[in-house]
Amino acid sequence: MAKVSPQKRTTVEQTPFVVPDLTVKDLLSAIPAHCYKRSAVRSMSYVVYDLFLLYCIYKATVFADARIAPEHISFPNPHLYTFARFALWALYSFANGLVGTGLWVLAHECGHQAFSESKTINNTVGWFLHSALGVPYHSWRITHGKHHASTGHMTEDQVHVPKTRAQEVKQELYDALGDTPIGASLSVASYLLAGWWFYLIKNASGQKRYPKGTNHFAPDATMFAPHHRDQILISDVGIALWLGAVCWAVYTYGFFEVFRVYLMPYLWVNHWLVLITFLQHTDPLLPHYRAPEFTFPRGALTTLDRNTLGDCGRIMGWLGAHLTHGISETHVAHHVSSKIPHYNAWEATDALRKRLAQAGLMPLQGAPVGWAEMYRVFRACKFVEDEGDIVFYKDARGLAQTRPVFNDSSVSDSGIELDKDA
């Protein structure tokens, strides 16, 4: 909680974060052995289920749309028919956006080889599913694998990498608008709408040491090795086919029809992808490490489990978790072992939480995934310090809400953060 002293200096009481001192064996052995088993048949059943849901939601929407007419329903004003159709298709795009996010998650499991025991099946299914959702499968699979190997590492992580104090440019417009409620809201909206493609095209929020122009479509990009070249080209072919299919559909059915049937749910998928991953890896409670203090277990525990749509009530929280296959609710276990399939991740999560509690570590569970939470986190997480091997996000005033505590009970400071610019 922030306080203003009589000298008009802002202070904040910091939450202690016990820096994990567990080994990889400690984490993996906490999870029951059967949780690591992968089944192609079971995983494929979820693909079929999601595709069936997409079809059913579409057919139900078309059926309802045909009955929003004077011969079926009477409205006092003709404009209400247009409004009702708009509301119906808006609901359709939201629902199929959630289901589409579930398909995205299954393709993501293919990239982790968690879909089945067969690498050929995994990469084939993953390429088709991700290409259909506008994702360069192998390109993203490679950088995402690096993200898992170095989560929370200041110079090796691949996405949601914090700016340092020196990198946080404070222009006049930013000073005037950036940290105001309206400025933060506009930033969050643009991030959710375009953040995914800006990451793919120009490495937005990615590793800061990569050169300008780094992107996921160039075979010779910095984050790829020479032997990745053919895989990147195969990914690019998938994107070219996807763009061609969208253009053909627009030519055949018209832009409006393609927009409401495919593009709006597609934008919702991108929205959920950005919202969920941002909140998994960004919070004032989570540390970031520089090389001297980084270990894989510490990196794996630099994430939070959250409930998608949990802030909208219990039923919506269940739907959010169910339709997105628990990607947000079981994310810590996913980082401990990314080969655990989603249907086993729930049990793995329960077992892992018990082990972390035994080690005296704080529960890695955050507030539900939602716009309000992203707004809060966006304002609280502006930059980290240029120095220090364990750093936490600070807000625009330069205040951190969390401080590191080690197993020997030592702390890095008094636990009171001062606004040094006050």
Where are these regions (language model features)?
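Juxtamembrane helix-capping/reentrant segments at transmembrane boundaries
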Residues: 115-134, 157-180, 290-314
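Non-catalytic, topology-defining segments of multipass membrane proteins
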Residues: 1-97, 131-264, 343-422
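Alpha-helical membrane-targeting segments
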Residues: 180-195, 306-326
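Transmembrane alpha-helical segments that form the membrane-embedded catalytic/substrate-channel core
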Residues: 95-107, 136-140, 193-208, 262-305
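Acidic (Asp/Glu-rich) catalytic motifs at the cytosolic membrane interface
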Residues: 100-119, 140-154, 280-283, 329-339
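General structural concept
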Residues: 59, 64, 85-127
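C-terminal, well-structured subdomains that either form a transmembrane helix-short loop-helix hairpin
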Residues: 319-355
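Multipass alpha-helical transmembrane domains of eukaryotic endomembrane proteins
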Residues: 211-235, 277-320, 331
